[in-house]
Amino acid sequence: MDAVTINSFFLVAALLVGASVLLSALSSRLGIPILVIFLAVGMLAGEDGPGGIHFADYSIAYLVGNLALAIILLDGGMRTRVSSFRVALWPALSLATVGVAITTGLTGLAAAWLFDLNLMQGMLIGAIVGSTDAAAVFSLLGGRSLNERVSATLEIESGSNDPMAVFLTVTLIEVLASAQQDLNAGFLLLQLLKQFGLGAGIGLGGGWLLWKLINSAKLAPGLYPLLTVSGGLLIFALTTAVGGSGILAIYLTGLLLGNLSLRSRSTTLSVLDGLTWLSQIGMFLVLGLLASPHKLLPIALPALALAMWMILFARPISVWIGLLPFKNFAPRERWFISWVGLRGAVPIILAVFPMMAGLPNAQLYFNVAFFVVLVSLILQGSSLPLASRLARVEVPAPPSPINRSGLEIDLDSQWETFVYRLSDEKWCIGSPLRDLRMPKGTRICALFRDQELLHPSGSTCLQSDDILCVIGHERDLPALGQLFSQAPEQDLGPRFFGDFLLEAAANLVDLAPLYGLDVSEVADQTLGHFIAHQLGDNLVVGDHVEWQGLIWTVAEMDEGEPRKIGVRFLEEDPV
């Protein structure tokens, strides 16, 4: 490769990445998932588009795809709160194993019939498209405020179902390559346990060692993110090399790092955010370049039928069976999880496996997988806002600062600076600072008014459009948000929880005269205990129950227990 070729590569890569970034603004305007924009840019630059770039190197696509997925999952794991496992771990694992197997079987049967393949070849297509995609799920759910049970289940499922899909795909490729048509159940179970066991063990063990290394190393601040990423990739590669799931390993590594005190945590998350965007852009650009629309047209109708079968039948059936043991999922939540079976880069990367193995019909497998992913992203991704409203799984977004940054003062304390802009409707407008009931341990460190820095004192009165800088901890965000945050723009309205928020510790006998309640059978219970008894374990914000003509909604949680309960009349619509 000469200097001119290398420079041309830099030129084309910079143009494609820049175009993807600029065109990403169309995503919100047109209601199209941003990943489709990246994919479309790659296809337009490809051999059938105006760009005319011929790209058919599946090994490079495999390399880029795995590298990008590893970074995306590391970032996703670091942003996942381990507290969400309280409500979603076992349901997500059920969907990641039983759900993927059922989806693979049902989709494989349909694929064999639609494309006139034998059963094993059809099952290979089912395995390739059988898992949800972490990149798509993290990207499309990241901007939506869904109830924790639903969002955590989808995110943990997408981060942990790839071992099952990889296991099924590799096993079926080996069967087809050796012309065997029977499978040894014991061998399959051993391989599956190897994928999950090594992935979980090395991911958590390696993550703990990486955490100790990061916190003990004395480095320049900008080097900690590089150490985190390189360590995560090392764990990913080592796990894959010994036959485990590297994808699961790096996700668990990120989960462990994100939930422990970590040196230069804020800088690391900021760098990872940029790397994740670059990974998504690069991965979908390469996959778009790899696709040839003229090769998709001959299989468009059967591939569309397969995609609709998977979306409308295979995925819902697998979700309802996978969630059967978990009674706290409402039917509307099950339907929404069924609909958000987003396919993305993982099926396309898995479709590269048969190409690299030289299997017959390998190009067909790739084209079908690409078409199914395209339909899933466009149909399911674009309808996600509507589906979340219809299923009523959205909850009001918690008030948040307009900016936050870490203060590397003490490794264990994790101090942060939160920046708030005051709006007209905040009750604190006109109040002196001394009258604010700030959370214990927080302090206003700066006040900006009309672009000037003021020196606040206890007598300083707040005005609209003031910008406050507050030092505190992440645990202080709910209380600070109630004081200072602007209300997020959303369609849920201010009365989602009701006109009144009641303390969960309130006794029902005290509430009875206020709301005309008959509490003769539950007079000795608190409101929170009664709601928990009605709704079951693992409550999340947004859970509600109808009782005596009123809707009682969990409005705030504290360490797994309801803290505040909203109440509204049955005929009121919160949407």
Curated annotation (Swiss-Prot):
GO terms for biological process: cell volume homeostasis. PROSITE patterns: RCK_C (PS51202). InterPro entries: Cation/H_exchanger_TM, FAD-bd_PCMH-like_sf, FAD-bd_PCMH_sub2, Na+/solute_symporter_sf, NhaP2, RCK_C, RCK_C_sf, Transptr-assoc_dom. Pfam families: CorC_HlyC (PF03471), Na_H_Exchanger (PF00999), TrkA_C (PF02080). Keywords: Antiport, Cell inner membrane, Cell membrane, Ion transport, Membrane, Potassium, Potassium transport, Transmembrane, Transmembrane helix, Transport. The keyword Transmembrane helix applies. It is found in: Cell inner membrane. The chain crosses the membrane at residues 3-23, 30-50, 53-73, 95-115, 122-142, 196-216, 232-252, 271-291, 304-324, 335-355, 364-384. It catalyses: K(+)(in) + H(+)(out) = K(+)(out) + H(+)(in). It is a multi-pass membrane protein. NCBIfam families: PRK05326.1-1, PRK05326.1-2, PRK05326.1-3. This is K(+)/H(+) antiporter NhaP2. The gene is nhaP2.
